[in-house]
Amino acid sequence: MIHSKKLTLGICLVLLIILIGGCIIMTKINSRNAQIKDTFNQTLNVYPTKNLDDFYDKEGFRDQEFDKRDKGTWIINSGMYIQLKGGALKSRAMVLYINRNTRTAKGYFLISETTEDKKGYVHNKDKKYPVKMERNRIIPTKPITDEKLKKEIENFKFFVQYGNFKDFKDYKDGDISYNPNVPSYSAKYQLNNDDYNVQQLRKRYDISTKRAPELKLRGSGDLKGSSVGSKELEFNFVRNKEENVYFSDGINFKPTEEMNHEQN
């Protein structure tokens, strides 16, 4: 009888330890997930910034990678990627480097086509058109004979100029993951076609599918902040081996010297 009571007590203690351990683990996971969501929210707070000139006065995260005299450079990029069944992956995107030291901004508009041959080799065809930004206007810096393309470039709007994530904190049922080895982290949320950002993308791009997209946020580097890491987001309407329809966007703040090397 005594032995039976001791055995029962022992089992109860083991179960209690497991329960407490499980609660501690879940608390840590929930805390980390909240931290990841908060990290993304800090980046998404810059949406919308309708006037790109405002980035000259926006301060980003600074760490030991920055020279004390360096005000830093913002890198913003937006692009639409479409691959119909059996076709090439075609994209039209723009990248802009906004130098806070010189208060100048330059970049390029990129038209890209990616195909895969029968042997599995990938082939890329890229065409870059250099641009600059002045008074919130995109201006080609080299002559463009194609008037339609010229207008497309001049009228280009980055997602940060019209996107809005004011309700991001209310997003629920997200799939949040974290890899401490890289470190990297991500969050995925299924959207609906009534979402403001989805409506804005459909208004500006020829998106053939009626399928509502999944919003995927990706980040790398220290969760507390790092100029070494990066943050990007995607609206994935269709993603598979045969067909792709997605929109990609990124805003990052980097040391200017590092960006000068990247542009050269």
UniProtKB/Swiss-Prot annotation:
A lipid is attached at residue 23 (S-diacylglycerol cysteine). It holds the Pfam family DUF576. The keyword Glycoprotein does not apply. Keywords: Cell membrane, Lipoprotein, Membrane, Palmitate, Signal. One of its GO terms (cellular component) is plasma membrane. It is found in: Cell membrane. It is a lipid-anchor. A lipid is attached at residue 23 (N-palmitoyl cysteine). Residues 1-22 form the signal peptide. Gene3D superfamilies: 2.50.20.40. InterPro entries: Csa, Csa_sf. Belongs to the staphylococcal tandem lipoprotein family. This is Uncharacterized lipoprotein SA2273. The lineage of its organism: Bacteria, Bacillati, Bacillota, Bacilli, Bacillales.
